């Protein structure tokens, strides 16, 4: 139902994973996705769990700038400069932790364009999606890219103030055709 409410297309029951909070699922997603030496783009400033999960999985985190002078939005040109032949994906934390920035549709569309051009998987950490103020509205990046493979994360700890309850979910959206081995790995984990 969450995916329906957020307008996230192409998600079936077998595309949803539950876990002991989003933290567990982030680690699991990286362990199934990364090979030694693979690079993941991560926002700076970042939520430290992403760095740890990437390193634990044999990957290398590469920070892209979220510019304070631009309301903490990701610097798209900096993202493009950081992409190498080893880059496999991009982490998007929206709303961002720790900055609190809520990314506008235009920024999300630019990130989608970069991901398409470079065949990157987007890992969308959107656990703060219900904690937006002042009539702002969160847009799930997956709702803008029904064709693009995106790994989405959310849970109850922030929006329902039950951090100790440890209930999170991860859903896979978009075209999963080229990611069967990854999905099989997740199923084993």
Model region roles, listed by residue range:
Residues 1, 82-86, 109-110, 177-189:
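Short, intrinsically disordered, charge-balanced linker/junction segments flanking boundaries
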Residues 62, 68-137:
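Active-site phosphate-binding strand-loop segment of PLP-dependent enzymes
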């Amino acid at each position: 139902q969450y995916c329906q409410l957020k307008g996230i297309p192409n998600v079936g029951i077998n595309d949803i994973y539950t876990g002991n909070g989003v933290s567990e699922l982030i680690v699991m997603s990286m362990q199934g996705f990364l090979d030694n030496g693979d690079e993941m783009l991560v926002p700076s400033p970042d939520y430290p769990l992403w760095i740890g999960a990437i390193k634990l999985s044999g990957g290398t985190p590469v920070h892209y700038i979220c510019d304070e002078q631009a309301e903490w939005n990701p610097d798209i040109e900096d993202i493009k400069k950081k992409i190498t032949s080893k880059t496999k994906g991009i982490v998007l934390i929206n709303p961002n932790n720790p900055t609190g920035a809520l990314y506008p549709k235009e920024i999300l569309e630019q990130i989608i364009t970069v991901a398409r051009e470079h065949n990157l998987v987007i890992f969308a950490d959107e656990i703060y999606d219900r904690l937006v103020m002042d009539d702002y509205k969160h847009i799930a990046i997956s709702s803008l890219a029904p064709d693009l493979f995106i790994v989405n994360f959310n849970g109850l700890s922030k929006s329902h103030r039950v951090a100790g309850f440890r209930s999170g979910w991860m859903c896979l959206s978009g075209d999963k055709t080229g990611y069967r081995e990854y999905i099989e790995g997740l199923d084993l984990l």
